[in-house]
Amino acid sequence: MLTTHWLPAARLNVKQARKFSLLSTHASFPATMYRYQLERKATLYDVTQDETRHRKDAVNVSADGLVHAAISKSSPYSNGPVFMPNSRLMQQMLRFDFDRYQEEISDGKALLDPTVICIPRGTPIPSALVLWREGMSRFSLQPSSPMEIEKLNDALSEFYEKSGTVVGAQEWIEKHPYRESSPDDNEKGWMEV
């Protein structure tokens, strides 16, 4: 049985503590989780700098020039990449984003490398990052202490390379039919897969 490790409250950004609705904090992945992104490496960006990029890679950079761990009521909701188990909502979001990417290619946008990153259950989180559970089946990897966006991208890319498996989005969709996903409220179902 996997034990959830709770991180000390000191790792939270005290100035932003009232802005988020945090369900739990984890030192390891409590379930196998996935993330869709358009490139193999992390490409988070400052939401105020570029309106043309993939919105789910946007984060808020504070006035001090650093990314602070945060959950917001408006987009971007998480200040880090979102991971989800193979749930209905995850499948719907991934398929929608991949269909949208294919439409953009048809409209002449540049080819990218849409992938799904898989992080297995029990994988420890590096000290530079923290895993927050924000919703029923929604988790995000965020900086454990404020850092520059480039360093956050480097920490995430290194974590993906060392601890994750990267699969092409089309291949992942073909190997993971929607009918095999778990309802988001069936925590026992997706936690034990």
Regions flagged by a language model, labelled:
Residues 2-193:
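NAD-dependent ADP-ribosyltransferases
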